[in-house]
């Protein structure tokens, strides 16, 4: 009875993480501006919203790591394919957390320090700092999502031999991984923003699928 209750609790936690991820994504500040002063103004204006959304992502990713450790134990954490997926998710989440901190806290803080300044020479440090943050975010976020997609792939392979819901979830995981990897690695740079958002949505749906599998006890280790 205790095991069943803990399974339902884990399923509820995964479902909440999936839902919160989608809600945070829907409320992500749009930013805006073309010139440096416009970008600084927009980032400073949205500082509170940025902190809430990106801070929420960091907390959610932390909760997901805890949840996926429990799922890995259910799948059989000693299995190489399961352990590899867990490590990949943890590393990917760490990269995403750093990206979120830069995007949601560092960039708005930098912008706030330079709000109202119009002298190009005085804005040079802001341009340099914002460019550095942008480069780091552009590296950390795609790689973090790819590592999380690798977890989805490895765990999908781990449950692909089963019938019913596990097989359906495995097929989804494999297809979603192909879409994420293909999009992030092959698509034009101009589409990168939309592809990153799409990857987060696909991963959130996978968390929901894991919640269903755990809640129905369809992936207990055999």
Set out the residue ranges of the language-model regions.
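Hydrophobic, aromatic-enriched alpha-helical segments typical of multi-pass transmembrane helices
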Residues: 1-222
């Amino acid at each position: 009875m205790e095991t069943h209750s803990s399974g339902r609790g884990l399923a509820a936690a995964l479902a909440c993480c999936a839902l919160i991820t989608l809600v945070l994504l829907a409320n992500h500040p749009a930013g805006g501006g073309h010139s440096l002063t416009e970008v600084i103004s927009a980032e400073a204006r949205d500082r509170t919203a940025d902190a809430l959304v990106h801070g929420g992502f960091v907390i959610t990713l932390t909760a997901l790591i805890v949840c996926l450790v429990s799922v890995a134990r259910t799948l059989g954490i000693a299995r190489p394919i399961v352990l590899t997926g867990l490590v990949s998710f943890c590393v990917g989440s760490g990269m995403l957390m750093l990206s979120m901190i830069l995007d949601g806290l560092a960039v708005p803080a930098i912008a706030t320090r330079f709000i109202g300044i119009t002298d190009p020479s005085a804005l040079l440090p802001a341009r340099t700092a914002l460019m550095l943050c942008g480069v780091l975010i552009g590296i950390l976020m795609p790689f973090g999502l790819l590592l999380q997609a690798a977890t989805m792939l490895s765990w999908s392979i781990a449950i692909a031999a089963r019938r019913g819901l596990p097989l359906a979830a495995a097929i989804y995981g494999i297809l979603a991984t192909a879409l994420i990897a293909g999009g992030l690695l092959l698509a034009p740079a101009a589409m990168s923003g939309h592809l990153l958002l799409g990857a987060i949505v696909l991963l959130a749906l996978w968390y929901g699928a894991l919640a269903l599998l755990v809640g129905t006890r369809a992936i207990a280790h055999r």
